[in-house]
A protein has these predicted regions:
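Conserved Switch II/interswitch segment of TRAFAC-class P-loop GTPases
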Residues: 103-104, 114-135, 145-164
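Conserved catalytic-core segments of large NTP-driven translation/proteostasis enzymes
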Residues: 155, 161, 172-328
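Conserved G1/Walker A P-loop phosphate-binding module
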Residues: 39-78, 83-96
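Conserved nucleotide-binding/hydrolysis micro-motifs of P-loop NTPases
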Residues: 102-103, 126-130, 154-159, 189-193, ...
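Short hydrophobic alpha-helical segments enriched in small aliphatic residues
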Residues: 4, 10, 18, 25-28
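C-terminal effector modules of nucleic-acid-centric enzymes and ribosome-associated factors
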Residues: 158-162, 172, 275, 295-617, ...
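Residue-level signature of catalytic and energy-coupling elements of molecular machines
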Residues: 52, 58, 77, 98, ...
Length: 686
């Protein structure tokens, strides 16, 4: 291994290398060795606490790794940026995220605090609870960290009486929080007292920690990026969901300097390392270093997220449940500018509380966060809000809808009601609500994944549940795909009703017409919708016997064309005129004049014959169906006797028609796939 944090030369004899924070492991290009390790539970542990309370020393005492990697950190003896270490205890692999304690570096602390499973709240025995202890602990509560413990460090520096006093202060400090009743351990990183007990306690807590979803859409918030000459760009972060494999095509979202939602920059995962070991696959809950192929370092920065290409979308607005800390210096007025920390990103935003003009300290409400630059978020993601100036932590919350529309003032009550439903929804109900929100456009599986982050398996189960409950309709016949829209039943039925009413009005105005053109209905009602939805609505109405589909025509099942004896005779006369003409068609105007009825009715009869297929339009000509069918049979016999090839001259000789009719007929036959043109020759396909 070679230390890259100090910029040492990489030997040219190396064939290739995979990089992890601070190190390089050499191996052959194109080969990603699988490290055979037993299945372990993966837990991310974050430190929290005031500056100089011994967080980094504690991590080193546990793991043997000095998480301070910067020269300035070592010179000044304080942590400035996040650091990492790992430890295996039994069947649990711990990844430690060591965060800075100084108030100036809280934004760095926030970049590392996302995705932790357990928090180790560090309190120095010689100082007890201090300002950054409080702010870090507020952040952990706002991020909804569920479990952890308290470590009283520097226990060797004070007497028993003071230790007991600090323990009492700590107990009072965490009362009513997730750390109430949690283990409180005395540790000396210098002497090693309490370190073994700390490892055992972490193992017990890990056993109760919730497993992450390895099948959800993968997301890796980038907290560090760097490059190695001759090798490329490397990013690191905690994989908070899903899995990433060597060779995967990934997308970095949002793109650098993006002013609005836009596709990300794509790259391929050339190599992976998890906790210092080369691997083919990284799973949720692991610290990962990824060498990216096809992207420059200038296109990567802290705060972006790595995800599977094309699966997720960034947004400039987030709907959320926002809570203001009771310790916030003042209320948060509508459109206040704040610093939003989500994942590893810091984004400036305006807060718009829904249904109120101000959020008071200690209160919560639904709010829309309008971002000045886009970010990637999903429902369930927790965030921190810090005041724009002075920069202090004032609150936080959870994302409910990551791709909302902009809410106007008059829509606030409706938006809040919608968010209340989403907030309480389980995975099935969320799919149902998202599809309901999509209205008549519906929502396909990929769109649902982009709005929820759920795995395809979860979405498929949820979609089956809502269709079985008749809350939605799958807008496609089998086989269904990820792009098959799911339409809420009320919206689907509304479209079906519009088809029925459109046909009813058509039949009222044109009682002698057999039906309305399928394409005309599509353009009138479905032009702005995916084609699958049009096909599904029509198929559903036909299945319910409410409409009849006859070739390219649609009609209500109840519609019948009733002609008088005189009208039927005129219609039959028109058909007979074209049948007698064969492949030497008479002009339509001449046939109408000979029909025996007025021009308007004769034109309707001709259109009825065309709609029913008895007459066939070929360019500007009209032929009887029997003539076209006879032509097909003539071509079939010609092919059997003379082979499949014929030119225009042979076609004219075969049919007895002039070039005036031969060319349109041949072009029609090409469209019907009866013939296929190749230069001046046709091939008979029958």
């Amino acid at each position: 291994m070679i230390d890259v944090s100090r910029g040492r030369f990489v030997p040219k004899s190396a064939t290739a290398y995979v990089i992890l924070p601070g190190k390089i492991v050499l191996f052959a290009i194109g080969k990603f060795p699988r490290i055979p390790t037993p299945i372990m539970k993966r837990i991310i542990v974050g430190t929290a606490g005031h500056i100089d309370h011994g967080k980094t020393s504690l991590v080193k005492a546990l793991t043997g790794v000095d998480a301070d990697r910067l020269k300035e950190e070592k010179e000044r003896g304080i942590t400035i940026d996040i650091g990492f270490a790992d430890l295996t205890v039994g069947d649990v692999h711990f990844g430690f995220v060591d965060v800075p304690g100084h108030e100036r570096f809280v934004k760095n602390m926030l970049a590392g605090a996302h995705g932790i499973d357990l928090v180790t709240l560090v309190v120095a025995a010689d100082e007890s609870v201090m300002p950054q202890t409080r702010e870090h602990f507020d952040i952990c509560r706002l991020l909804k960290v569920k479990s952890g413990l308290v470590v009283i460090t520097k226990a060797d520096l004070v007497d028993e009486e003071l230790l007991q006093l600090v323990e009492a202060e700590v107990a009072d400090f965490v009362a009513g929080s997730f750390l109430e009743g949690a283990p409180v351990l005395r540790v000396s990183s210098r002497t090693g007292v309490g370190v073994d007990e700390l490892k055992k306690t972490l193992s017990r807590l890990a056993a109760r920690a919730r497993e992450r979803d390895e099948n959800a859409v993968a997301r890796l918030p980038i907290d560090r990026s760097f490059t190695i000459k001759g090798f490329g760009t490397v990013v690191t972060g905690t994989l908070i969901a899903g899995r990433i494999r060597a060779g995967d095509e990934l997308e970095i979202l949002p793109p650098v300097s993006s002013s609005g939602p836009a596709p990300g920059r794509r790259a391929r995962a050339r190599g992976l390392q998890v906790h210092g070991k080369s691997t083919q696959e990284a799973l949720a809950g692991e610290r990962v270093a990824i060498n990216l192929q096809g992207i420059d370092l200038a296109e990567v920065e802290r705060g972006q997220t790595l995800a599977p290409a094309g699966r997720l979308r960034t947004s400039s607005m987030l709907d959320a449940r926002l809570r203001l800390l009771g310790s916030a210096p003042r209320g948060l007025r509508a459109r206040s500018r704040v610093r939003l920390h989500i994942g590893a990103a810091e984004v400036l935003a305006r807060v718009v509380p829904l249904g109120r003009m101000e959020l008071a300290p200690g209160d919560s409400c639904f709010a829309q966060l309008r971002l000045e630059t886009p970010t990637l978020a999903l429902p369930g993601d927790h965030f921190i809000v810090r005041a724009y100036s002075p920069v202090v932590t004032i609150g936080g919350g959870v994302v409910i809808d990551a791709l909302p529309s902009k809410h106007r003032l008059r829509e606030a009550a409706q938006a809040a009601s919608w968010l209340e439903k989403l907030e309480a929804a389980d995975e099935v109900e969320r799919v149902a609500l998202l599809v309901e929100m999509a209205g008549e456009r519906g929502m396909d599986q990929d769109e649902i994944a982009a709005r929820s982050g759920s795995s395809n398996e979860v979405i498929k189960r949820a979609a089956e549940a809502v269709t079985k409950a008749r809350r939605a309709v799958t807008a496609s016949p089998p086989p269904k795909t990820a792009l098959t829209p799911l339409v809420a039943r009320p919206a689907f039925e509304e479209l079906a009703g519009r088809v029925r009413s459109t046909l009813k009005e058509f039949h009222r105005k044109s009682p002698l017409e057999s039906g309305m053109g399928r394409e005309e209905i599509r353009e009138k009602i479905f032009a702005h919708l995916p084609p699958d939805i049009f096909r599904a609505v029509i198929a559903n109405l036909v299945e319910r016997n409410e409409i009849v589909a006859e070739k390219d025509l649609l009609r209500l099942s109840s519609h019948r064309v009733a002609l008088s004896a005189e009208e039927q005779a005129a219609k039959d006369r028109l058909a007979a005129l074209f049948a007698e003409a064969g492949l030497q068609p008479m002009p339509l105007e001449d046939a109408i004049a000979q029909s025996g009825v007025d021009t308007a009715r004769a034109q309707r009869f001709a259109q009825m014959l065309i709609n029913s297929g008895e007459l066939v339009r070929v360019a500007g000509l009209v032929f009887h169906r029997s003539a076209i069918d006879g032509l097909r049979e003539t071509l079939r016999k010609f092919k059997a006797e003379h082979g499949p090839k014929l030119d225009v001259t042979a076609f004219k000789d075969l049919t007895g028609v002039s070039r005036k009719y031969a060319i349109p007929l041949l072009e029609y036959l090409d469209l019907q796939r009866v013939t296929r043109r190749s230069g001046d020759v046709r091939e008979i396909l029958l």
